[in-house]
Swiss-Prot record:
UniProt key word Transferase: yes
Domain Response regulatory: 720-831
Organism from which the protein derives: Agrobacterium fabrum (strain C58 / ATCC 33970) (Agrobacterium tumefaciens (strain C58))
Residues annotated with Phosphohistidine modification: 478
Pfam families noted in UniProt: DAHL (PF19443), HATPase_c (PF02518), HisKA (PF00512)
Protein name stated in the entry: Wide host range VirA protein
Length: 833
């Protein structure tokens, strides 16, 4: 995972295209217009109702005018004609309006319209009949009245006058209420009047004629009037009006429902459009945020470009990257902790601002527990700032914590601190924080691997140089051991022969002392070539330092003060105390050479716990428990340009004063053999400090005598020791040493010579054989079977002999040169075994 994010097609999918939003806006506007626009033609509907009401009014006015015309109140028939014309016009307008209206006109409406037309036509016919006959009737009534009024003046008889009065009374009754009886009675009176004319024949004749006209026309006029008065035009118009109102009401209800529905649809579309626009704006803002995040990732990558693979560059790069993350999320602080998955301790921590925060253990453990228990990729929590860092309880603010598994061993916990309580978190921001944290962890891991790779390359290069030097030095040291063995052997024998103090004895002592120093140099060379046999046992570093403290004081100059400091914790390690002794001797010797005047060397032994991985000057040390052996001085210090090369073999800044360049190289070799780590810090003019981290041991420590043995040299009791050495000079030296130790030596040049000697029935208690005399690929068990006894192999530091679990009891390997005491211990140990 590289921590980078590229917007995908899914990120740009907002749920609606711009043209679809525009279509929804148009649809919402159309639905809104349909909802606010009236579907019915209200003007037409009102005109229909007006025409129906006008028909009612015109019909009533027509009936009124007909009654007035019948009563003779009006003699002009023009109002009746105009009313009738208005009625017909209203009917035509009504038909036209019904065609224009949106009312649903069914059969009922059509039938009512037809009935209304028929009623108007019937009324028209009745009015026409009424008009023609009513004129005649009114003329007849007028003539009848005039004749009746002049008849008494012209008649000469009282009977005629009486009959005319009776006739006038009957005619008045007939006009008011026509009936067949009155008609017969009036006809009878007219006949009677004609018979008794009494000289008034003209008035009587007019009276009789007009009377009979009235009797014949008045019923027809009354019928026409009754037909007009009983016309159902108004009733049909009222029924039609009710039907229209019902249809209008029903259509209004339907229209209202439809408008409510359309309005609801329009409102719903508007809400949906608003939500789409809101989502589109949020998505746009989110994509803008993602693009800003891409720039942040690029800036984080730039922070880790170059700078070199060092701890300081890693810290500065991580600090700059956290500052970018802090600025991106508008936080007040930003910190990152890499916590070990197992022990839940912060292995590394970084912060955007210095100093780094002190993480609260409870918060770390809680987040680690949640991250381990949760199957999801990350765990998000919001906590008070004082619960995340070791801050005072009154510290305000909150912290946004995100924990996720960075690797199989580490859990990354990122903290964003906010002043006050203005934190606003959302899933998108948490996702971006997770991606940014993963990206940062990726770059940190890459930088760490780069650092480790560079360190491994330097160590490999250093190991290759050591191997090359060791290969060369091993061959040279082997030849020197042969020469030095002869020198020390003869010197020790001469020393044993000269018991008294003399000049010769002192010279021999100097020879042995110089030989011992030469042997130490050869041991250092063999340390570089890894050709020394190591005996490892648990021992206390504190006890060892106290044991060799007098030796260290004697080895240093008088102007140098040596101080020791030990803590109460156990400082048991597993290894060889000789290696620790040699490390201290070399470090103290180097420190003493750094003083031009008085100085002080501090040796401290302590037990420490390293909570996170630590980058040293020459390697990387994992977190854990260690025994720390520190040697520090206040001398001149080491130059920065020299510091990377101090552990290289034969590198020295004091070649003119006899420096060999093997001391610190041997120290580095011993530390590696003890599976430890070494770190050095130095400042010119202020001093140097060497810190040696050794893995502790839980075993019970042994006493120093288990390594160094007692002071008295063990001697033999005449046991036969066979010796195989092709070099006659060395063979003679070894024979003299063996004889001086109380044993009976028998020397042979080859293994075959020894086997021939054994085949003759001879038997040796022990066999000493030089490495060069052994055939290749022969096991120690085969030697034991051939020699019939145990063997001691001289110069066996680089022996390529196959060993089994039983071989160690049948052979012992001694590196050259061999001192008399070492040989005495080896022979006595194998013979007793």
């Amino acid at each position: 995972m590289n921590g980078r994010y590229s917007p995908s097609r899914q990120d740009f999918k907002t749920g609606a295209k711009p043209w679809s939003i525009l279509a929804l806006v148009v649809a919402a506007m159309i639905f809104a217009l349909m909802a606010i626009t009236s579907w019915q033609d209200n003007e037409t509907n009102r005109a229909i109702l007006t025409q129906l009401r006008a028909i009612n009014i015109d019909s009533a006015s027509l009936q009124r005018d007909v009654l007035r015309a019948e009563a003779g109140v009006v003699a002009n028939y023009r109002p009746i004609i105009s009313r009738l014309g208005a009625l017909r016009k209203n009917l035509e307008n009504l038909k036209r309006l019904f065609k224009q209206s949106h009312l649903v006109i069914g059969n009922d409406f059509s039938q009512l319209l037809d009935k209304l037309k028929v009623s108007v036509d019937t009324t028209d016919a009745a009015v026409a009949a009424f008009g023609a006959q009513n004129v005649l009737l009114q003329d007849s009534l007028a003539s009848f009245t005039r004749a009746l009024s002049i008849l008494p003046k012209m008649s000469s008889t009282d009977q005629t006058v009486e009959n005319s009065n009776e006739l006038g009374s009957l005619m008045l009754r007939f006009v008011r209420q026509p009936s067949p009886a009155l008609s017969l009675e009036i006809s009878h009176e007219l006949d009677m009047l004609q018979k008794a004319s009494g000289g008034a024949e003209v008035p009587i004749r007019i009276l009789a004629r007009e009377g009979r006209v009235i009797l014949s026309i008045l019923p027809r006029v009354n019928d026409a009037v009754n037909m007009i008065q009983t016309s159902d035009t108004a009733e049909i118009a009222e029924r039609l009006e009710r039907k229209c109102l019902e249809a209008y009401s029903l259509q209004s209800v339907r229209e209202q429902r439809a408008r409510i529905f359309l309005g609801s649809v329009s409102v719903g579309l508007c809400i949906y459009i608003i939500s789409l626009v809101y989502r589109l704006r949020r998505k746009t803002a989110w994509l803008t945020r993602r693009l800003d995040y891409e720039e942040v990732i690029k800036e984080i990558g730039v922070c880790f470009e170059g700078g070199g693979a060092t701890a300081s560059s890693l810290n500065s790069s991580a600090q700059a990257a956290l500052g970018i993350i802090q600025r991106f999320f508008n936080a007040e602080s930003c910190a990152l902790a890499l916590v070990d998955h197992g022990d839940r301790w912060a292995v590394e921590s970084f912060a955007a601002k210095l100093p780094e925060p002190v993480w609260e253990d409870l918060a770390l453990r809680e987040m680690v527990s949640l991250a381990r228990a949760d199957e999801r990729a990350s765990v998000f929590r919001i906590m008070s700032t004082r619960k995340v860092s070791c801050l005072p309880p009154e510290t305000p603010g909150v912290s946004m914590l995100l924990a996720h598994k960075s690797t199989d061993q580490l859990i990354a916990i990122c903290s964003l601190g906010y002043q006050g309580y203005r934190l606003k978190s959302c899933p998108g921001e948490v996702q971006l924080l997770e991606l940014a944290t993963a990206c940062l962890c990726h770059y940190i891991d890459v930088r760490r691997k780069q650092t480790e790779c560079d360190i491994l390359e330097r160590r490999l290069e250093h190991a290759e140089r050591l191997q090359a030097v060791g290969t060369l030095a091993g061959g040279i040291a082997h030849e020197f051991n042969n020469i030095l063995g002869a020198i020390l052997g003869y010197a020790e024998m001469a020393q044993n022969m000269l018991r008294r103090s003399s000049v010769t004895r002192r010279h021999i002592d100097q020879i042995i002392s110089s030989g011992d120093r030469a042997r130490l140099i050869i041991d250092q060379i063999l340390t570089l070539s890894r050709k020394l046999e190591r005996v490892t046992k648990p021992f206390s570093v504190s006890e060892l330092v106290m044991e060799i403290a007098p030796l260290l004081r004697v080895a240093l100059q008088r102007n140098i003060e040596l101080k020791f400091k030990f803590d109460d914790k156990k400082s048991v390690v597993e290894g060889s105390p000789l290696e620790v002794q040699q490390m201290l001797m070399n470090l103290c010797k180097n420190a003493s050479q750094a003083f031009t005047a008085d100085g002080q060397i501090d040796i401290i032994v302590s037990r420490i716990f390293v909570s996170r991985q630590k980058v040293l000057a020459h390697g990387v040390m994992p977190a854990g428990d260690y025994v720390l052996l520190s040697v520090s001085d206040d001398g001149e210090g080491i130059a920065e340009t020299v510091l990377p090369h101090i552990f290289e073999p034969f590198f020295t800044t004091r070649s003119c004063s006899g420096g060999t360049g093997l001391g610190l190289a041997a120290v580095h070799g011993h530390v590696s053999a003890l599976a430890g780590y070494i770190d050095v810090t130095s400042a010119v003019g202020r001093g140097t400090r060497f810190d040696i981290y050794l893995p502790p041991s839980s075993k019970k420590p042994v006493s120093p005598d288990a390594f160094f043995g007692p002071c008295k040299t063990p001697r033999g009791n005449g046991e036969i020791v066979a010796l195989i050495e092709p070099d006659p000079v060395l063979r003679e030296v070894y024979e003299d040493k063996i004889a001086a130790l109380g044993y009976e030596p028998v020397g042979f040049k080859t293994c075959a010579d020894l086997c021939n000697w054994i085949s003759k029935g001879k038997q040796a208690d022990l066999v000493l054989v030089d490495q060069s005399s052994l055939p290749e690929n022969q096991s120690a068990t085969a030697l034991h079977a051939a020699f019939k006894t145990a063997s001691i192999i001289i110069g066996g530091s680089d022996l390529k002999m196959s060993l089994s679990s039983d071989d160690m009891t049948s052979a012992l390997f001694l590196p050259k040169p061999i001192s008399s005491r070492t040989m005495a211990y080896a022979i006595r140990t194998k013979i007793k075994a």
